[in-house]
Structure formats: structure tokens, C-alpha cells
């Protein structure tokens, strides 16, 4: 925070302190006036009024008689004003006692005590400051704005070591006394917590931690896909991590890239509230997408990961071979293989299975047909499948393709017949396995499977969550 901003905050608080002092003195005057009126309203305590009431005074007889004597001026008196002045000098100073204040009603005494405390604090305070922490700030950086040094910082950090690890966005409010010593520090740690440090008479500080209680509420957010599922989920407040996890759980059930505009979805979230205000903390418990007349779910388990309704990650998982039965490997995966036709060193990015022409080729896992094409100078007729976002499989030298681009396939479904097209030494199937675009050995790669890693008890708890998600996200 710029120094100018701190100065403005200090001046603004000074004005409020002056207003408090003014209110205090006005209240004192009003109370004193009320006390004086109360005293005067008691006739029995005033000798003048009691004399009139007793009848001791009679009607003045103004007729002269022989026993009366005329008033003679006093030769020693200097003036009438002197006599008045003498009388004034004899009057005692009027003082309010605690007994007079005790006669006030209780609510008036409470109000007076409150005003006295406020005025005392306002008089003692000379400077007030505020600051919002930025990245890399330390407590010393904060307090130096008001002229304090390490001698004020170290006792606070010794009392609360967490003051040595400030986070951007946290706020501080602090007060200096008339001697420019730190008297009060308020640290807004988060929306749910604040810590107060007050200086005692011995110079040490005491700490008070105030925690606000929050509540978590489950809510359903509904929407329709506009540009893409990811952007639509982001508009609903989901962060990048949550979107990625949900996409990973759904990608094996439905082709996310082919979801059309207007596709409906519903999200089950739990959110934290302070009163009626969101704290920004929340969790996505489940997601439903309705496409092609079917509902697809991603439900969070106790381990924080998302699975389909059966607790599976990849539906039926991957098979090791793209054939109905195991076949002989005629050429293994080899990044430095010499091509048998061209004679040049050329990486062999897959495995060749020696099979007769027309042998059925099957999908090793659920997926989508990404490409069907023909390359005369190499792969011949080939098919490429995509399995989620990470995995691709490629099948070359085919005699016939049985699928079309964009088509969804299931594990074990026939996708082509083996052949001898392109540059080939004889009938065989060339099979490649790619992870994030990089070819790996199909026979040794660790295949992604269906196991969730959940125990029997965890799976039972997960299925309870599934039923709750289905009930709350029901279309």
C-alpha cells in the first residue's frame, strides 16, 4: 500500500476519534444539566421554599409606627456591589460527587461509562494504520510504514511464528499510542479467522484468535454447453484442476469433443458459507452429462478421484493384443531398426504380428475412430483410434476397414481385417500404441486398467455417493 494511502486512512480514523471526543463532552454536559435540574426539583432541600411553605412569613406591614426605626446607611460600606462581591466570595465551589452519579438510572450510568471508555481510547490514540499484504511482504515491511522497527516485530513473531509467513491479500490494522509505540495489531488471516495482539502494561503482547464458524451446503448447478464443456464448466466456477479431473473420468464414456451446443449438464457441489457469503472454498462431488438420450456420470470417491457409476476409470480397460488370439511377433518394437525393404535405419514404432490376410482386428479398449486413410508409400490402409485424451492406437497394412471416422467403438469390436497393403514384405498387422503422441512398446507398456484402488469398504461408501448423485442430479 502506498504511504499516501496509509496517511489518508490514519487521518480518516483521527477524524472519527475527534467526533467520539465531541460526542463524549456533549453527553457529559447533558448529564450534568439533568443532575442540576434534579437537585433543584427537591423543595425539601431548599430552605427558601420550605420557609414559604411553613407560613413563617406574614404579610409585610408597611405602615410606620413608633417602635420602628428608619434604615440608616452604613458609613463603612463602600458600595452595594461590594456587599454582593463579599457574598459571592463566601459561596463554596459546587462539585459533583459519586453519590450524585449513582442517582442516575442504570442505563444512563452504562451509557456514561461507555462514553468515558471511548473518549479515553480516542484521547490515547494518535495514529491508526491499515495495509493489504502483497507477494513477498514481511511483517517488518508492513509495520515500517508507521515508523516501527525490528524491536516491535520480533516480540510479535516470538508470540505467533505464523506472522513470519504472510500471504498476499491478508490485511493488517494497527494503532500507535502517543509515544509512537505499537498498542494494538489486528491481523485478518482469512475470511474465517482474525488475530488480535494487544500490548499489556508490562510491554508484552497478548494474542486473541477469533474464528468465524462456517457451514457447507450442497447445491446443484445446471447449464448447457455453449462453446465447449470445459469453458461451460469454467463459467460455473470450476477451476482448471476440477475440470481436468472430471474430463478424465468422462472421456472413456463419451466423446467430449463431439458434445454439441445445448447439451445439458448438472454439477453437484458443496460450498462453504460464512453467513450468506461464499468463502470461495468448495468441492465438486459429481457431474452428469446428458447426450444422445443417455446420462453419463463422474462421481468423486473418498480418495478424491472421479469414477463412473461402477467405480471404474476406463470402462472395461485395455487388452494387450488387438487380436482375438495371441499371434507370433515377426518384428518387435525397435527405435533403431533397419527397414527390411529400404535398408535404411528407421525406427520401428510398433509391433508386427504374423497373421494371414483377412484376420479380424479388434479394438483393445473403448474409443473413437479418429482416422481411416490409405498411404501408398508406407502404411497402406490404416485405422487410428483414440482412447480418451492420452491414448491412441494405430493399425496398418489392412486389407479392409470396418469402421468410419468419428464412430464410437467398444472393446473387442471388429474394426478391420489384416492385409498386405503399402510397403510390406508379406501379410501381417502392424500395431502401434501412443501415449500423448509418443510411440511406446505395446507389449511392455503398463496398460491403463479399470482398478480404482478402492477397498471393499471404500467401494461400498462410493456406491452410496453414486446413489446420492443420481438422486440430486436427476434430469
Swiss-Prot record:
The chain crosses the membrane at residues 19-39. Its EC number is 3.4.24.-. It is found in: Cell membrane. Keywords: Cell membrane, Hydrolase, Membrane, Metal-binding, Metalloprotease, Protease, Transmembrane, Transmembrane helix, Zinc. GO terms for biological process: proteolysis. Zn(2+) binds at residue 348. Gene3D superfamilies: 3.10.450.350, Glucose Permease (Domain IIA). This is Uncharacterized metalloprotease HI_0409. It comes from Haemophilus influenzae (strain ATCC 51907 / DSM 11121 / KW20 / Rd).
